[in-house]
Amino acid sequence: MIQLEEGKKAPITQRGDYAVVAITKHGVEIARNLGRIFQQSDVYYMSKFEKGDEQEQNIQMFSGSVRMLLPSLFESYKGLIIIISLGAVVRMIAPILKDKKTDPAVVVIDDKGENVISVLSGHIGGANELTREVAAALRAHPVITTASDVQKTIPVDLFGKRFGWVWESAENVTPVSASVVNEEEIAVVQESGEKSWWHYEHPVPANIKTYSSIQTALEASPHAALVVTHRDLKKEEEAILENGVLYRPKVLAIGMGCNRGTSAAEIETVIEKTLAELQFSMKSVKALCTIELKKDEEGLLEVASKYGWEFVYYSPQELNSISIQQPSDTVFKYTGAYGVSEPAAMLYSGADTLELVKKKSGNVTISVALIPYD
C-alpha cells in the first residue's frame, strides 16, 4: 500500500501507459472495470475500499490525500483517468501543470460513469481520443470542448500526427489554429506525404483550400497556411510561413551500404550532408535500408535508433529483383547483390526513380528515395 505523505514523492509502480484513479465506492467499481478493459492501465484507489484481490489484480491502494499521489502519476504516465469531480481535479492539477507539449492527458469521469470529460492535453497529449475510447467502453457521453473538434475542422496541432508528421517549429501553431477555427482563409499546401488527412465524413470546410505549390498558394493571399513538404523552402517561399506551420511528412527512404565497422558518427555525417545537398529535411526520413548482411551493423543500428527511423534490410535476392542504374560486379562478389543502397531505397519506398541514385563517401554508399503517395 502507498502511504502518502506531504512533501514526499509517492512510491508508485508503473506498468502501463495510463493511470486510473478513484476515491469513492462507485468510482472504485468504475476504475476496476476500466482496468479490465484497458490492459495498458494501472488502477489506484483508496485503501478503505479494499476488496482483497488487489495484489492479484496489480491494483495499487493508497492512504492519504489523493492530491499527494498526482505529481508522481503526472510525471510517469501518458494519461490519467480520474474518477473525481471536475472542479476538484482542476484544483489539484493546477500547481503541477508544466507545458502543453509535455503534460499528460487528463480525463475526468463523474461518479456515476455517465460523462467522460477531456480536461487537459486534448490534442497533443491525446486526451480527446482517450475520452472517446473510455466513453465507448462505459457507454457514457464524451465531453470534448476543443474548438477544432466541435467544429469538425483541422486540428493544427494534430495535423498529420497519425502518419508521423512533425512540425518544423511550434511557433505559429496557436495563431494558425485561431485562423482555422475562426474560419479565415486557410491554404493547405501539400508537396509530399499521405493525402488522406481529412477523416471526417463531411467535405473539407469552404475556408480551407488545397494547393500543390507554395507559389500558387502565395498568389491566393491566405490568412494562414499549413505546408506539408520534405524539402527546404526557397527564400521567396518563406513568406508563406509568416502565419503558417511547416510539417515534415515521413517520406524519405535512405538506402545505405557501408564497410564493416563504420562508425555511427561517419554514417550520420554522410546522411546529414547528403540531405543538405538535396535540400531535404532530416525530419522527413522514415527508414534506413540496407542488405541483410548488415542487419547487425552497429553504426547503422545506432543512427536508426537515435532518430527513431525504421531499420530495414533485404536479402540479396530481393535486392537483385530491382533493376538499377549502376550494378556492380564487385559488390556482387562480396554480397551476392549487384547493389545495396539503390535497390534497398527503391524496395522500401516503392518509387520507380531515386532522388539520389548513388553517392560514395568514405566508407559509406548512400541513395535517397521519395515515397510516392497517390
From Swiss-Prot:
The keyword Hydrolase applies. InterPro entries: CbiG_hydrolase, CbiG_mid, CbiG_N, CobE/GbiG_C, CobE/GbiG_C_sf, GbiG_N_sf. Belongs to the CbiG family. Keywords: Cobalamin biosynthesis, Hydrolase. It catalyses: Co-precorrin-5A + H2O = Co-precorrin-5B + acetaldehyde + H(+). This is Cobalt-precorrin-5A hydrolase. It is an enzyme of class 3 (hydrolase). One of its GO terms (molecular function) is cobalt-precorrin-5A acetaldehyde-lyase activity. It comes from Priestia megaterium (Bacillus megaterium). Its EC number is 3.7.1.12. The keyword Hydrolase applies. Pathway: Cofactor biosynthesis; adenosylcobalamin biosynthesis; cob(II)yrinate a,c-diamide from sirohydrochlorin (anaerobic route): step 5/10. One of its GO terms (biological process) is cobalamin biosynthetic process.
